[in-house]
Every structure is written in structure tokens, then in C-alpha cells.
Regions:
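Short, well-formed alpha-helical segments that are part of the catalytic scaffolds
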Residues: 13-32
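Short beta-strand/loop segment that forms part of the nucleotide-sugar
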Residues: 32-48, 102-103
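A conserved acidic beta->alpha catalytic loop
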Residues: 46-55, 133-134
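Conserved donor nucleotide-binding strand/loop of the catalytic core
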Residues: 54-74, 79-80, 84-120, 158
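Acceptor/aglycone-binding surface of glycosyltransferases and processive sugar-polymer synthases
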Residues: 98-106, 110-120, 125, 137-219, ...
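Hydrophobic helical membrane-anchoring modules
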Residues: 217-352
Length: 352
């Protein structure tokens, strides 16, 4: 029997988690009617949530454990959170699914949560999914079938529409994908989700890339395993609110470009060379003009504009170089990707 590990990063997803579990359990129950060749491990990663997410996780783990060991019945961890408890109790748990949780000491970010999931997943196949049901669990059977029957190491998903997303956000997202594919050596598909199912060898390759500044979409493309893409219509989140602001997405995009491309540094160097050549050309022009025509070089406003323009370019280039230096600095410090404060996984590494 093959084991499939599902990594679910969560940040303030208490309202969505019970609905996600209910939908996932329904899909697995339907699969069990056709085959009993798979067991499922669901790793719920609490990324320093400030709501009841951790309690809901514990309740899900407890209830899935009861399906495997009915004699272990005891009070639920979330009896005090009645609304979420009721939603969790509505979910029917198949016997071949085990929920486990990992809770961080603070918010380390989705990339750290995914890395924690990869580090602790024990399945033959490993998938990453969002808890808000924007990654439809109904695609899992098809993804599993493709890995089992076709010559692929990964099955990934991409949105073909951005229905429900602000137009300006959609525009900048499309431009980002075009830009990063032109200037980097990582193939990042437009509309790609983190939702993908991978064989163990691909997961091991991801774990071998242990850098602190992570951009998983770039890592998935950089390691180069054969991937089949499944397209689907955009799905709105089932509950809660998005954690990604426009500024947060912009910062994420900048980090992705810096992590997988040296082009910004090359552009900064080119600007420096261009400005140097231009300044020498202007000096030569004004010198010859003075010698031949005797014209005075007047116009302090134009001089101020030129100085400000050059200064702006210099600060831009310094900022680009500063970003690379800052990334190098964080890598050299070798701080842990995350710190675990609580988990029901016995042999988990608390700091990694």
C-alpha cells in the first residue's frame, strides 16, 4: 500500500479547515470504493496562527485517530470552540487517513511551512494544498492516476482564469511570470499553483536545496523533473480572508526574481557603464563647443535634473545590490527555517 502525504500550510484558517477536511475525506471515501491501494497522511502546518486554527487541527487529528483506534475516545481538544467543533464533527473520516499537526512558535511564512511539511512527510507521493479549497481535492484522484500510469515525476496545477481576483492584481501577476521566465533559469508557469503531487525523488531534491530564502515555484521549476500540468477554473476561497496583500505579493515577486536571477545586478552594472560613457561624451561635447563657438554652458535647471537623474539611478542600483547582499547575509547566518512549539509527531525536529 502506497502512502500519500498531503501538506496543508495554515495561517488563521480555523473557519476553512473543517470544510477542507470534510471535502478531502469525501474524495478519499469515494476513492476507497474503487481501490484500497493508498493510505493518506495529512500534515497540517500551523504557521503561528492567532485564531483557533491550532485547536481545530488538534480536533481533526483526534477524530482521525479515533477512526484508527476507536478505544482511544476522549474529550475533543476543541470542545470549547463550539462552531468549529460542530463543523469538524460533521466530517466523516475514512480509516486510511491520518491527520497530524505541526505548530510553529511564530509566523515564519508559507515557504517555511511547506519546507516543514516536506521535511516530515513520509509518503511515497507528496502533495501541497491550500486549506481554503482554492486547490480542489477532487483533482487528487486524477493526479494520482497520472503518476501511477504515465512517465511523470510530478503532476502540477495551474489556473486558466483569475475570476474573482482584482484586475490590477491579475495584470501584475501575468507580467511577473513573463519577466521571471525571461531573466531566470527556472521555468515558472503562468497561473501555477503550489498544488502539485510529487514522487519521493522530487521531494528529496527539494529538501537538498536547503537555502533560507525560499521561492518554491522557482525551486519546482529549477530542479527540472518531468511534470504534467492540469488546468482548472479559478475557485474562490471557501471561508476566511486572503493573507496576501498587494505589497506582500510584490515583495514575494521581488524575492523570487532575486533568488533565481542575476539579471538585476547585470542591469545595474549596465546602467553604471552607460552613465559613465554618457558623462564623458557630454564633457567632450561641451568642451569642443566652448573651443569652437565660445558658447557658455548655461542652464542650471538642466544640470540639476541630470544630477537628480544620475543620483536616482545610483540609489536604484545600490538598492538592488543591497537586496542581494541582504539575501547573502541571511544565508550566512544559517538561522533555522522554523521552530516547532507543538506537534503530535513523536520524532519531529523542533528546530530546522
Amino acid at each position: 500500500m502506497k502512502k500519500i502525504s498531503l501538506i496543508i500550510p495554515c495561517y488563521n484558517e480555523a473557519p476553512a479547515l473543517p470544510l477542507f477536511a470534510k471535502e478531502l475525506n469525501k474524495v478519499i471515501t469515494q476513492m476507497n470504493k474503487e481501490t484500497h491501494d493508498y493510505s493518506f497522511e495529512v500534515l497540517l502546518i500551523d504557521d503561528g496562527s492567532t485564531d483557533e486554527t491550532k485547536d481545530v487541527m488538534k480536533d481533526l487529528c483526534h477524530r482521525s485517530n479515533l477512526c484508527e483506534n476507536p478505544s482511544d475516545a476522549r474529550p475533543s481538544a476543541t470542545d470549547k470552540t463550539t462552531s468549529n467543533k460542530t463543523a469538524v464533527s460533521d466530517a466523516s473520516f475514512p480509516e486510511n487517513i491520518a491527520y497530524k499537526y505541526i505548530s510553529f512558535s511564530r509566523n515564519f511564512g508559507k515557504e517555511a511551512a511547506m519546507y516543514a511539511g516536506f521535511s516530515n512527510a513520509s509518503g511515497d507521493y507528496v502533495a501541497v494544498m491550500d486549506a481554503d479549497l482554492q486547490d480542489p481535492p477532487t483533482l487528487l484522484p486524477e493526479m494520482i492516476h497520472i503518476l501511477e500510469t504515465e512517465d511523470y515525476e510530478s503532476v502540477a496545477t495551474r489556473r486558466v482564469t483569475r475570476k474573482g481576483e482584482p484586475p490590477i492584481r491579475s495584470f501584475f501577476a501575468r507580467q511577473f511570470y513573463k519577466l521571471i521566465n525571461k531573466i531566470s533559469d527556472a521555468n515558472v508557469v503562468d497561473g501555477a499553483r503550489d498544488f502539485r503531487l510529487m514522487k519521493r525523488e522530487m521531494v528529496d531534491a527539494i529538501l537538498a536545496m536547503s537555502e533560507y530564502n525560499r521561492f518554491s515555484k522557482g525551486i519546482f521549476g529549477w530542479i527540472g523533473f518531468k511534470t504534467k500540468w492540469i488546468e482548472f477554473e479559478n475557485v474562490n476561497r471557501i471561508a476566511g480572508e486572503t493573507k496576501w496583500s498587494f505589497f506582500g505579493l510584490f515583495k514575494y515577486a521581488v524575492n523570487g526574481i532575486i533568488n533565481f536571477s542575476e539579471t538585476p545586478m547585470s542591469v545595474a552594472s549596465s546602467f553604471g557603464i552607460f552613465c559613465t560613457i554618457l558623462s564623458f561624451a557630454m564633457l567632450l561635447f561641451f568642451f569642443i563647443r566652448k573651443l569652437i563657438f565660445g558658447d557658455p554652458v548655461a542652464g542650471w535647471p538642466s544640470l540639476v535634473c541630470i544630477i537628480l537623474f544620475i543620483a536616482g539611478l545610483q540609489f536604484l542600483c545600490m538598492g538592488i545590490m543591497g537586496k542581494y547582499i541582504a539575501k547573502t547575509y541571511t544565508e550566512v547566518k544559517e538561522r533555522p527555517h522554523y521552530i516547532v512549539s507543538d506537534s503530535d509527531i513523536e520524532d519531529i525536529k523542533k528546530i530546522k
